[in-house]
Amino acid sequence: LFGEIRQPATEYVAIPRHVSETRKYWTAQINPPSVICGDANMLVSDPDGLQFGFISSSMFISGQRTVGGRIKSDYRFSSTLTWNTFPVPELDEATQKRIIKAGQKVLDARALHPDRSLAEHYNPLAIAPELVKAHDALDREVDKAMGAPRKLTSERQRLEILFANYARLIRG
């Protein structure tokens, strides 16, 4: 019954299965392999931080809000509905590095307040300005990587890109 081991041997992103509907970003966290991922989380191996960058973006949560699940009014992460179908185009190494670097800036902004939990970091009424700035920079990189021709200012613009990318990927 408990014979299946899924703990990765590298750093991984712990992805909470549920986040509050008030969240502007998915509250994921990078953990070392020595930290056991509990059953209230999903995980994706992420030795370089690229996956963290994507899941921490407005592009991801826009897709999650639209095609992901819910429990009551909160968002429910699904690897099959939202993660495995997230339509990321082929990325060159320079683009990947920019997303990784921008994701690291999000982590750096969180580290400025080590006493705060993830819930406290992302309280919409108390999110630190430096964390907002870091997420804005990450959004610019992810949006550009996903094909945005200009700065995106709405969820609708992000959804248009997501659905266009998805349609392109399923056509082959």
Stretches found by the model and what they are:
Residues 1-101, 105, 167-172:
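Polybasic, glycine- and aromatic-enriched phosphate-binding surface used to engage nucleic acids
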Residues 85-172:
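Non-catalytic DNA-recognition/assembly elements of restriction-modification systems
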